[in-house]
Amino acid sequence: MTKIIFMGTPDFSVPILKELHKEYGVDLVISQPARPVGRKKVMTDPPVAVAAKLLGIELYQPETMKSEEALKIVADIEPDLIITAAFGQLLPENILNVPSKGSLNVHASLLPKHRGGAPIHRALINGDKETGVTIMYMAKKLDAGDIIAAKSIQIEDNDNTGTLFDKLSRVGASLLMTTLPYIIEGTNKRTPQTESEATFSPNILKTDEVISFNRPARDVFNHIRGLAPWPVGHTMQDGKRLKIFAAELTNKTADAAPGTITGKSDNGFLVAATDGLVNITEVQLAGKKKNNALDFINNNSDLIGTKLGEDG
């Protein structure tokens, strides 16, 4: 029987954990500790920890994997495999070297493209037409290990980070189940990554959340959906932060300065970019509830002709 330790944190990892546990059994789940969430700062377990408890799997939630305690807990399992999926911590070499059949990662990009912590967000923001999942051996260098298998999917115009997370999570679970028998037998392929083709997708910073309209409409649209539904991009409206949850491309040309609200649409309001208009469909003004953009502009029709700013 194959002994497996699974490491993961967000919703992306949960279908992978469930499928892995159903088919092989997971001996230990390692996830991030509970964190304060929301205005009331309620201590909340990450989705993988919640799933592990529901599945009745032993759970360990360390602040760091670089401690002697973490090494002992992993080594005591005597695992054949460590499998990670969006765990959120770098594993030291002494952990990576414990399992007899290797340490694997389910990464949400077509490596070596989009190494790093935000491959799904960055694929959308960059305007990529396709993305995918890679099963790889972990190495000391982040996301640089040998590739075992990969599967690509198309990025559609109606995708955002949330929909791509869901799609790639399912792809990752399926690809892992297809690949694991060969890994366990030791008959899988492993292909070194081409370093010259590597690109990097670091975690989203606060500065990345500012939506600028001073660029082509397609770039604005990609930026908005790449941050939706989290962490959500924003602009400024008369000194107040305006979050933009959703938008659409139009075939309308711009005849106003970038950032200008030019009028209403059937389901929102239109904002000028450098080469066309972006249709904003869901917003939230600071201190207010999230609202569909048509209701927002109907209640604030005096904003038509004003300009959304980039400060804040």
What are these regions (language model features)?
Residues 214-312:
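An anion-binding loop in the catalytic cleft
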Residues 35-55:
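N-terminal beta-loop-helix "entrance" segment that forms/cooperates
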Residues 202-215:
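Acyl-group handling in specialized metabolite and lipid biosynthesis
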